[in-house]
Amino acid sequence: MDILPRSLPATVVRVVEELPESLDQTYARILLRVAEENWEHTYHVFHTLMVATRPLTMEDLCLVLAIDFIAEVTPKYEEIWRSDEPEDNLITVCSTFLSFIDVDGSRMAQLSHYSVMEFLTSQRILRLEPKVARYRMYEEPAHVTIAQMCLAVLLHLDEHTGKHAVEEIPMIHYAAENWVYHTRFGNVATEIRPGLELLFNPKNPHLAGWVWLHDIDTFWGEPKITANPRRLDTAPLYYAAQCGFTDMVDHLLSTYPRQLNTLGSRYGTPLIAALENDHLEIAWMLLNHSADTTVMTGFYGPPLIVAAKRGHLEIVRFLLERGDDVNVWESYIGTPLHVASGVGHLDVVSLLLEFNADVNIRGGCYGAPLQVVTIRGHLGAAQLLRESSVDMNTQGGYHGTPLHAASAEGRVEITRLLLEHGADTNARAINSETPLQVASRMGHAEVVRLLIRHGTDISVEDSVFGSPEVAASERGHQDVVHVPG
């Protein structure tokens, strides 16, 4: 179009007559104009834009042009391939398919129109000539491409890479935050495996570099940047298990068997990391290599508690049959029965009861298992515990008895179950409240009705809230105040 104003009329007519008849033909013609030596770069740019988890800056996207995808062993980041003119280079390989916008001081790269990706992922493109059809986009290969790019820049890190040098590496923060996601989505393809083996090799510093930039082994709200930028003691097996990389765990177990019980910070052992993140194939692999199931580190407790909480029935059975303590407990969350009951895994609860789990043991912050069940509202688990000679009036935890807990949480059906099986309607909690006072104060009118029908003392008072009627009135629960006594 730039030359038309200076062209003869006959030339203008010829150009207009040769214009593509459809958008697909327009895109196909643009792709055919991409130089043959650049087509793979163009393909990788499309891959990156297809599956990137967030918009990329022009500099980040230009990383595609600095990756040697045919390097020996695994794709490699070539620093000398970086360009001082990233926008011009991207336009060279992608023509008019790309556009750039300024957002908060950053130059962001994007496809020029949503129809571009629709065309590239459609079946229609496969009906065009081979040099166009080769650009067909598929999701899994796209994740493989971006995973290779992420690994390439992470493998560029070593113990001598300072903070300033890191900031000069394109896409480094994106890579640190997202490579695990892309690698999982790429199903740890053959093309990714060599890079993973280098990253998780205990003799290399690359894994420590990633952990320094973005430590996934932190709790919510904690900074991802670690305090120590050179955690060279990072345990590869622990992180591989946490990430869910089955083949890599198998490789590390066969190559570095001493790492079996190495400790991380958040979960403790590789086995607990695998169980908590539901990587069951890895968990079985570690158990079959005789992983230690007695370790009490981290926040989550030993493997039996974690497996019970996550509902991993067969692993719970395996651990119990080989002799793990059915009543093992962690100071905050209690025993396997506490956690399985609290989450509502009825099959696990039944199994634990078959192995004579103590239904009245008090531990953790809630008291006995029945109190946990009541607070969480799992009627089925409450029924299983009731059938196992549970003490309906056990005291403990924040609320007092299970009936106090049910009254506080408004659990109508569980309240009915407790009342029908001997719960004391006039029991006192630590603060001297009865269940009726608790239900009144919290505004649970239906629970109040149930308690009154079962003969609770409606005249009872305590020094903090007074009578049930006063407690309800002060909180504005008029429906409770008017419940007939």
Where are each of the predicted segments found?
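Thr-biased low-complexity repeat/linker tracts and other Thr-enriched repetitive architectures
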Residues: 313, 330, 346, 356, ...
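Leucine/isoleucine-rich amphipathic helices and adjacent mixed helix/strand linkers
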Residues: 1-265, 273-284, 310
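Ankyrin-repeat boundary/"N-cap" motif
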Residues: 227-237, 262-270, 296-303, 329-336, ...
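Ankyrin repeat domain, specifically the short helix-to-loop turn at the C-terminus of the second helix
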Residues: 251-259, 284-292, 317-325, 350-358, ...
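Conserved ankyrin/ankyrin-like repeat signature
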Residues: 247-248, 281-282, 314-315, 347-348, ...
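Leucine-rich solenoid repeat scaffolds
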Residues: 452, 458-485
